C-alpha cells in the first residue's frame, strides 16, 4: 500500500489579498430570524384559539392548552432575549471609536 502525497495547493481554496467576506450569511440570518418570528406568531395564535375554544365551547384538553400556552410563553421569552441582545450589540457599535 503506497502513501500518496497531498498537494495542498489543490486542496485548499485560493484566497487573494483584500478579498472580503460574502454577505450571503447576513441575509440568511435575517431570513432565519423572520421565520422564527412567523413561527412564534403562529404558536401564539394557536394558543389563543385553543384557550378560546376551551373556555367557550369546552373543546380540547386543558393539559394540551396549558402546554401550548407554555410553549408560546417560552418562544416569547426567547424572542425578547434575542431582541435585548441585538439592542445591546447595536449600542456597543454606536460607542465604538473609529
Swiss-Prot record:
InterPro entries reported for this sequence: FliE
GO molecular function: cytoskeletal motor activity; structural molecule activity
Domain of life where this protein originates: Bacteria
Keyword Cytoplasm (UniProt): no
Gene Ontology biological process terms, A to Z: bacterial-type flagellum assembly; bacterial-type flagellum-dependent cell motility
Sorted UniProt keywords: Bacterial flagellum
Residues that span the membrane, as ranges: none
Pfam families: FliE (PF02049)
GO CC entries: bacterial-type flagellum basal body
Cell compartments where the protein resides: Bacterial flagellum basal body
Keyword Nucleotidyltransferase: no
Family: Belongs to the FliE family.
NCBIfam families the UniProt entry points to: PRK01699.1
Protein name stated in the entry: Flagellar hook-basal body complex protein FliE
Species this protein is from: Listeria monocytogenes serovar 1/2a (strain ATCC BAA-679 / EGD-e)
Gene: fliE
